[in-house]
UniProtKB/Swiss-Prot annotation:
Belongs to the class-II aminoacyl-tRNA synthetase family. GO terms for cellular component: cytosol. GO terms for biological process: threonyl-tRNA aminoacylation. Its cofactor is Zn(2+). Residues 1-61 form the TGS domain. Zn(2+) binds at residues 333, 384, 509. Binds 1 zinc ion per subunit. Catalyzes the attachment of threonine to tRNA(Thr) in a two-step reaction: L-threonine is first activated by ATP to form Thr-AMP and then transferred to the acceptor end of tRNA(Thr). Also edits incorrectly charged L-seryl-tRNA(Thr). It comes from Nitratidesulfovibrio vulgaris (strain ATCC 29579 / DSM 644 / CCUG 34227 / NCIMB 8303 / VKM B-1760 / Hildenborough) (Desulfovibrio vulgaris). This is Threonine--tRNA ligase. Its EC number is 6.1.1.3. InterPro entries: aa-tRNA-synt_IIb, aa-tRNA-synth_II, aa-tRNA-synth_II/BPL/LPL, Anticodon-bd, Anticodon-bd_dom_sf, TGS, Thr-tRNA-ligase_IIa, Thr/Ala-tRNA-synth_IIc_edit.
């Protein structure tokens, strides 16, 4: 039979394996990198037989995302094999691949600990060095039950009995046999770069009534270099952890016993947040947005009308007042539409751009709450643009310009994707085509590279997703620009056209930074707590050497404060080295040391938090330097408002 392999039509003998077929089509170097293949789209082992009628065979390489997933899944099996060798009484349960790695759950005589990792990794390495093959077999379900009962693997027996299939597939790696759909790597030698990472407890099948299992997490990559880079990123992430830095810098706290998933902002953290909020308000006013604010509670009937009650109520909070049910808002769009409807709108009035730093509440399960990055109460830089269809493209390009300017300001690279119509959607073909074309043309006019996510739009309209990339390569969902045909229809939003008739506008939902809490958390990690001078809660600290400099330091502090610098004075009777170190740990941009020599010269010794010493400078020079470096961006100019 003739089969397509990477663009070539090749004859494949009946009964040949995928490996045989690929060996004849690929160079030796490429073939050695193949882990599995796709037969007409279905993922199978490289040893699988090519069925008659197959039209396409696609190799799955070790350095592809699918290949990496296979390596990780297979490494979980290798780890389970090693654990069973070292701890024969341990019972195995499940071991999938996950983002950035894999895990396996065991019912062991004692919980595993990181102290066990070295021995387990040594045993895993033996399996890898032996290039132990992965061998697939199939057997009737009853025989599989008997097999695992004979091995004392009661959890596997429970899983098999719950399966609807009459036949199940098994994989053998050495003496270890596991229930698994597969596919797997050809042999353990492909899992040459792995690391066990951590242990945790996990209830069997996630039910706290079931036994507590011991879960071992690990990671694996196609080569040692990539693994080393990944481990370095993990260490960097620990060093930059916003939860640790938030406590160290006294920015915020959580009190889970009284308000889980809700932030208590301390003065310094609230100052950072306020600076960002003030900046956002001024930028939006410059770009001709109207600043509005809606209520926290809206009658349940409104959420039913919008569709949120049917589709989103599990994430909402409800309360009752005077026998009426109210929903605490999880988003701001309904209030903005009611503001739009409060007056008759002409085509000349459009677009209307409503901006709100809106506090919203969304119920997140306690297990997914994570510092500032996943909370239950947060503030969105939310806006809704209600415009004529012919204005849509220009409005979107202006939003993209704002995204670009803010990402550049905070030092982030970013990726853009346009998500198109899903299978289940509402609205006419014409409306979808208009909106999708407007999004694509706007991105192209901006000169920004983008990808298309086919079918990933919302059911009510296409969208642009922006993911920012931080300094250690992580991606974070940030801006969303979304076209909506549904809510203007449901809430009967209209404008009077040039023809005197009523017309339906288009609504654009957009958030640039998204959740301010999450964005500040990402910022803390991006800067490792060392905010740029304009954003630092304390921009300069004056340090005395002895009490003799106190009077001069107070006059210097007053001069800097008058110039708008956020400055503190440390006149404690402590050693200078201690005070300098403390200021550095607090990430204060400018450390200004004053001793007798500086008082005599009428200046200060300027040090940066990095340890660099700028030397003695007059007070006027210091004021000028800090005024320039600490000036807020919206006072400097230079922000652009469109694409040429």
């Amino acid at each position: 039979m003739n089969v397509s392999i990477e663009g070539q039509m090749l004859e494949v003998a009946s009964g040949a394996s995928c490996g045989d077929a690929l060996k004849g089509a690929l160079s030796g170097k490429k073939f050695k990198n193949v882990l599995a293949c796709r037969l007409d789209g279905g993922l199978v082992d490289i040893t699988a037989t090519v069925p008659d009628g197959t039209t396409t065979i696609e190799p799955v390489y070790a350095d592809s995302p699918e290949g990496l997933d296979l390596i990780r899944h297979s490494t979980a099996h290798i780890m389970a094999c090693a654990v069973k060798r070292l701890f024969p009484a341990a019972k195995v349960t499940i071991g999938p691949s996950i983002d950035n790695g894999f895990y396996y759950d065991f019912d062991a005589e004692r919980p595993f600990s990181p102290e066990d990792f070295e021995a387990i990794e040594r045993e895993m390495q033996k399996i890898v060095d032996a290039a132990t093959p992965f061998e697939r077999s199939e057997m009737p379900r009853d025989e599989a039950v008997a097999l695992f009962e004979g091995m004392g693997e009661t959890y596997k027996v429970e899983i098999i009995r719950d399966l609807p299939n009459d036949t199940v597939s098994l994989y053998r790696c050495g003496e270890f046999v596991d229930l698994c759909r597969g596919p797997h790597i050809p042999h353990a030698g492909f899992a040459k770069a792995f690391k066990l990472m951590s242990v945790a407890g996990a209830y069997w099948r996630g039910d706290e009534k079931n036994p507590m299992l011991s879960r071992i997490y690990g990671t694996a990559f196609a080569d040692a270099k990539t693994l080393k880079e990944h481990l370095h990123r993990i260490e960097e992430a620990k060093r930059r952890d916003h939860r640790k830095l938030g406590q160290q810098l006294d920015l915020f706290a959580f009190h889970e016993d009284v308000a889980p998933g809700m932030v208590f902002w301390h003065p310094k953290g609230m100052l950072v947040r306020t600076i960002i909020e003030d900046f956002l308000r001024k930028e939006h006013l410059k770009r001709r947005y109207d600043i509005v604010q809606g209520p926290q509670l809206l009658r349940r009937e409104l959420w039913e009308k919008s569709g949120h009650y049917d589709n989103y109520r599990e994430n909402m909070y409800f309360t009752e007042i005077d026998e009426n049910a109210y929903g605490v808002k999880p988003m701001n769009c309904l209030a903005h539409m009611l503001i739009y409807r409060s007056a008759i709108r002409s085509y000349r009035d459009l677009p209307k751009r409503f901006f709100e730093l809106g506090v919203v509440h969304r119920h997140e399960k306690s297990g997914v709450l994570h510092g500032l990055l996943r909370v239950r109460q947060f503030t969105q830089d939310d806006a809704h643009i209600i415009c004529r269809p012919d204005q849509l493209e220009d409005e979107i390009i202006d939003v993209i310009a704002l995204v670009r300017d803010l990402m550049n300001l905070f030092g982030f690279d970013y990726k853009v994707a346009v998500s198109t119509r899903p299978e289940k959607s509402i609205g006419s073909d014409e409306a979808w085509e208009l909106a999708t074309n407007a999004l694509v043309k706007a991105v192209e006019r901006a000169g920004i590279p983008y990808t298309i996510n086919e079918g990933d739009g919302a059911f009510y309209g296409p969208k642009i997703d922006v993911r920012l990339m931080d300094c250690i390569g992580r991606e974070w969902q940030c801006s969303t620009i979304q076209c909506d045909f549904t809510l203007p229809e449901r809430f009967d939003l209209v404008y009077v056209g040039q023809d005197g008739e009523r017309h339906r506008p288009v609504m654009v939902h957009r958030a640039i930074l998204g959740s301010l809490e999450r964005f500040i958390g990402v910022l803390i990690e991006q800067y490792a707590g060392a905010f740029p001078a304009w954003l630092a809660p304390v921009q300069a600290r004056l340090l005395t050497v002895t009490d003799a400099q106190n009077e001069f330091v107070e006059s210097a502090r007053a001069a800097l404060a008058k110039a708008g610098i956020r400055v503190e004075a440390d006149v404690r009777n402590e050693k200078l080295g201690y005070k300098v170190r403390e200021a550095q740990l607090e990430k204060i941009p400018y450390i200004l040391v004053v001793g007798d020599k500086e008082v005599e010269a009428g200046g200060v010794n300027v040090r940066l938090r990095t340890g660099e010493n700028l030397g003695l400078k007059s007070l006027d020079e210091v004021v000028s330097l800090l005024e320039s470096d600490c000036q807020e961006p919206f006072k400097r100019g230079g922000m652009s408002y469109s694409f040429s």
